[in-house]
Design a protein with these regions (language model features):
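C-terminal structural cap/anchor segments
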Residues: 29-52
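Acidic, serine/threonine- and glycine-rich low-complexity intrinsically disordered segments
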Residues: 1-36
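A short beta-strand motif characteristic of beta-propeller blades
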Residues: 12-21, 52-60, 98-103
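Short glycine/acidic-enriched loop and turn motifs that connect beta-strands
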Residues: 1, 43-45, 81-85
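Conserved beta-propeller blade signature
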Residues: 35-38, 74-78
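Blade-level signature of beta-propeller repeat domains, shared across WD40, Kelch, NHL, RCC1
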Residues: 88-90, 95-116
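Hydrophobic/aromatic beta-strand positions that recur at structurally equivalent sites within the blades
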Residues: 4-7, 45-50, 89-92
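Repeated scaffold domains used in trafficking and secretory/extracellular systems
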Residues: 22-33, 62-72, 105-116
Length: 116
C-alpha cells in the first residue's frame, strides 16, 4: 500500500499521513509553488502543499507515465510506450488541462529538466 506523509522538519515528526489502498501506489510527487502533484492509476491529483489533504478526484486523466515533471505550469509526462521503441513526452497546460504537444523522443524517456 502507498502512503503520503508530511513531516515537520523542525520537530522531525509526521504531522499528516494519508494511507492508500493495498493496490494503490502514488508516484512522481512534484511540488510547484503551493501545489503538490502526484500520479495514481492514470490520474494526476493536485492538492495544496501547505495544508495538504489527499484529493479524492483526479484533476487530469492521462495515459501511463513512466515519470512526470511539473515545470512552469506545464506537466511533462514521459511515456515509455512498449519500452523497446521510441517513446513520447506529452505536454499539458495545467491551467486548462489541455494536451498542448506530443513530442517524439528516444527509448524510455525518464525525465524532463529546465535548463536556465
Amino acid at each position: 500500500a502507498g502512503k503520503i506523509s508530511r513531516i515537520d522538519v523542525f520537530t522531525n515528526t509526521v504531522n499528516y499521513s494519508a494511507d492508500f489502498a493495498t493496490t494503490e501506489h502514488p508516484d512522481f510527487l512534484n511540488i510547484e509553488g503551493d501545489s503538490l502533484y502526484f500520479f495514481l492509476d492514470g490520474g494526476v491529483f493536485v492538492g495544496n502543499a501547505l495544508d495538504y489533504l489527499v484529493p479524492t478526484a483526479a484533476q487530469l486523466t492521462v495515459p501511463f507515465f513512466y515519470n512526470m515533471n511539473i515545470i512552469n505550469g506545464k506537466l511533462y509526462g514521459c511515456n515509455a510506450g512498449d519500452f523497446a521503441s521510441n517513446g513520447t513526452v506529452e505536454v499539458y497546460d495545467l491551467s486548462t488541462n489541455a494536451l498542448e504537444a506530443t513530442l517524439n523522443v528516444g527509448i524510455i524517456p525518464g525525465n524532463v529538466y529546465l535548463n536556465e
